[in-house]
Amino acid sequence: MFSRPALTRGQPAGSSPPAQRGFAAVASPKASYEPATIAGVKVASRDDSGPTTRLAVVAKAGTRYEPLPGLTNTQKRSALRITREAELLGGQLTAYHTREALVLQANFLRDDLPYFTELLAEVLSQTRYTTHEYHEEVENVIHMKQAKLDASAIALDAAHAVAFHTGLGEPLYPTPSTPISSYLNEYSVAAFAEAAYTKANIAVIADGASEAGLSKWIEPFFKSVPAESASSISTTASKYHGGEQRIPKTGSNSVVIAFPGAALGANQPETSVLVGLLGGESTIKWSPGFSLLSNATAAAPRNFAYSDAGLLTVQISGKASAVRKVAEESVKALKGVAAGGVSQEVLVKAIAKAKFNLLSASEVSGTGLVHAGAKLIHGGQPLKVAETIKALEGVTAEQLQAAAKTLLEGKASVAAVGDLHVLPFAEDLGLKV
């Protein structure tokens, strides 16, 4: 039942001023990660005093340096015990890899920081790589991931391969035809883990924990992580090559058009704005969208930022005839930018989109954890959010025009997967490879 004051029964209509709608205040962006070194371990944290925490160990152990599996048994806990204890605490454990990093991440209630800090330290220093576990679990997981590879994933890997050859050109997951049994076993995995899991190669990133809280638990639990290893991770500087690769496949089609992009920490805000400008789909339900590719079928521009290189891609997936048409439109749109066809109105929208992409990637998907860790393990500093936003706001139409011209004048990396009778060659698109 409504209270009497809420009903205001009998009150004259004009006795109070009419309600007025106001604009909501602009929310401040989340604080940047603050770096520190605790007991020889590179750490970065930010604390919004919320009820939950995300804690991640980012190791320099991605496919660029050779792949390896994630969470498994440790000397103190079995995989089953780890799972059951995490469930009892309401936590979530995930392990995944990128081209440069292996990420062990835990999401949990704030008060459970001691348990999950100890658990992640155990995984680094006390994991047991058993023969039966490798053959019964790890091999099966690899085969399942190989079976799930679609044209989009294969095309993206192929574009990286022609762009960088080795290193960043290694696929995220090997294709079914890759002879992995000749190279991969429980001993090679254990040897790679020994080289990768050292204090010099890892960073601990926390979102929702204070530096003081981290220091209290990292110091005792991570002291068992070795400072260095007898063997080391092989690192070769990335070199962009460009080229073309075509792979026949039934059932699905995908084309990736790629160019040199912005590396992590590079002062190239125009690249992010160019991604926002190209867009690919409308983000508003009843609007056709402002982006140059908003009417395209499944066209997805993105800048893949790595420690010493970047790859700006436009990926198009769908029916072969539609993919060909949209690939042509994508290059046409980029040429339009190079010719100076960006209005002030569209530029403002593209900058706003770039700012949203930056902030949402950090807050929603957890990309900020990985990027902060990747920067630390490669000797850099975490992203400064306020400074980056200011740089995005300063991008001009002339900068976008110059960036687009530079891309088109250089060598592209083009990958086509699917019906090769229909899918275009780079030459058909007017691109140099």
What role is predicted for each listed range?
Residues 1-85, 190-291, 413-433:
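His/Glu-rich zincin catalytic helix
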Residues 2-17, 81-236, 294-433:
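Charge-rich, well-structured scaffold segments of protease-associated domains
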